[in-house]
UniProtKB/Swiss-Prot annotation:
It is found in: Virion membrane. Residues 22-146 are virion surface. This is Envelope protein OPG155. It comes from Vaccinia virus (strain Western Reserve) (VACV). Part of a stable entry-fusion complex (EFC) which is at least composed of proteins OPG143, OPG147, OPG155, OPG086, OPG094, OPG107, OPG104, and OPG099. Formation of the viral membrane is necessary for the assembly of the complex. Interacts directly with protein OPG107.
């Protein structure tokens, strides 16, 4: 055996030993690893320091492709009338006769969440902040929740 063969055998042996040590370390600390993951699971899909948004691809919803916070849909308490789904684009809308739109209101927060983040694509949006209604109460409310 020449010195080059011995060198590669030593490197390969060291690499295999490191793999075994890492495996044993994971085996010994598996309980701690599970506890750490459970504690920090809420931060798993948060925006990283590097600036790239991390997406939770397990569940598809309307906010997955949006990075601007004001554009993200959210359920908020509407004064005196339950809950509404809002973003910078406006409110989720109910379409009435003659294609008139009004704010879709929900009795509970869970109903609002279920409707807003369901698999159904809802393109009915009512934006009260377009001309000529810029100063109405609905527009002021929309601006206040964003």
């Amino acid at each position: 055996m020449n010195s080059l063969s011995i060198f590669f055998i030593v490197v390969a042996t060291a690499a295999v030993c490191l793999l075994f040590i890492q495996g044993y370390s994971i085996y010994e600390n598996y309980g701690n690893i599970k506890e750490f993951n459970a504690t920090h699971a809420a931060f798993e899909y948060s925006k990283s320091i590097g600036g790239t948004p991390a997406l939770d691809r397990r569940v598809q919803d309307v906010n997955d492709t949006i990075s601007d916070v004001k554009q993200k849909w959210r359920c908020v308490v509407y004064p005196g009338n339950g809950f509404v789904s809002a973003s910078i684009f406006g409110f989720q809308a109910e379409v009435g006769p003659n294609n008139t739109r009004s704010i879709r209101k929900f009795n509970t927060m869970q109903q609002c969440i279920d409707f807003t983040f369901s698999d159904v694509i809802n393109i009915n949006i009512y934006n009260p902040c377009v001309v000529p209604n810029i100063n109405n109460a609905e527009c002021q409310f929309l601006k206040s929740v964003l």
